[in-house]
Amino acid sequence: MCDKIFHNLSGKTLVATPYVITKGIYHKSLIYMLSHTEEGAIGLIFNRLVNHVDLKSFFKIKEDKITSQVMVPIYLGGPIEHEKGFFLHSRDYNKNLLLDFHNDLAVSSNLEISEDIAFGKGPKNSLFIVGYTAWKPGQLEEELEKNLWLVMDCSKEFIFAENPENKWHNALKHLGIDEIYFSSQIGNA
């Protein structure tokens, strides 16, 4: 048996193929990979808009800091730890970064960025994402072998595009794939 070559996908985007369960959180999802090592992988789904949230309430910001509500769109990043909030944002904001990527993107998860966004001092572009997705060692590689995911580089312009409903279709177009290709691969029961 041959050893498998490990390719680090940190900073890449996973595009769900129709082989992923047709209902549920991963159907037509796009996942920005935060970390991918031989110990496992972590990512944030960035095209599942679920609601709007008041940053003041979510981060329990004191009244004297922010006096009014600051409503932002909230995205579901995955099925794990929905009480944790992350900002996937442009690199023009660089205070207390959790992760810094070489493609003009960063991740923060602290009170300071939420306050800065509330006061208009935050990053030019950001998505507020709750929860995350994780894989055990070898699990993501197995899913890639089963063609559950396509891998792509994507720009901050793509990630922060206005309409989250079109992002999956646009990702397929970017990869040169027509969704019709998959329709012949999936049959009826």
Curated annotation (Swiss-Prot):
Q: Name the SUPFAM superfamilies on file.
A: VC0467-like (SSF143456)
- What InterPro entries would the database entry show? AlgH-like
Q: Which Pfam families match?
A: DUF179
Any one GO CC term of the record: cytosol
Fetch the NCBIfam families from UniProt: PRK00228.1-4
| Assigned protein family | Belongs to the UPF0301 (AlgH) family.
Q: Which HAMAP family match?
A: UPF0301
Q: Protein name, please?
A: UPF0301 protein RP032
Q: Which organism is it from?
A: Rickettsia prowazekii (strain Madrid E)
Tell me the classification of the organism that encodes this protein.
Bacteria, Pseudomonadati, Pseudomonadota, Alphaproteobacteria, Rickettsiales
